[in-house]
C-alpha cells in the first residue's frame, strides 16, 4: 500500500495553495498520455487502467485494477493552519475480493487517498484514507515500516468499508490537522503531497473507483 509514497519526492513543481476561502485544490483535466494534467503516474505492479469520463453531473477520474497497483501523485504546499479540512468525492463500483489492509496478503483497496506531510529521507509521514473491503469503518492502524523504507511513518484510517455504499457518489470531509494530532501526537505544519492509489495484486482480484475534486478548506 505504501510503496508509491516514496516517489512523491521526485516530482517537479510545487503547487502552492494559500487562500482564505474554500479552494479546489486538485481537479482532473486532460493531460498527456491519459494522465490528468498536474499529476504523475506511478506503476507498482501490472498495467495501469485510468481514464477521464463523464459520469452523472460531470467529469470524473476512473481507476480500474486487475491484479495491479498504481497511483497518481502530486506535490502541493497546503497550510493546515488556514485550511485544515480535506473534502473529496469518490465512488467505488467494485471492491477487491477479501481485501483487508490489516493483513499483508490481502492489503488491497479500490480507493485510497494519501496526504503526505513529509518525504524527507529520514522522515516520511502520511495518512491514508481508504475504502476497505473488509475492515470496519473507523478502524485506524499504523502500518509497520517495510525493510526497504525504515523511515516511513504511515497511518491508515478506514473511512468506508464494504458493499453498502457501492455505486454511490459520496462526499467525505476529514479534519486532517486533527487526525494528524491524534495519530502522530504532534502538531502538523503543512501538506507536501497528495496521492490517489488503487491496488488488487495481493488478492489477484479486481477493483474500480471514481474520483472528483479534492479540496482543502478552512
Predicted regions and their residues:
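Solvent-exposed strand-to-loop "edge" motifs in beta-rich extracellular domains
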Residues: 89-95, 118, 177-179
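Extracellular/luminal beta-rich ligand-recognition
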Residues: 108-153
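Extracellular beta-strand elements of beta-rich domains used
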Residues: 28, 194, 212-216
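Short carbohydrate-recognition loop motifs
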Residues: 50-71
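Extracellular beta-strand ligand-recognition surfaces/modules
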Residues: 108-113, 151-162, 166-205
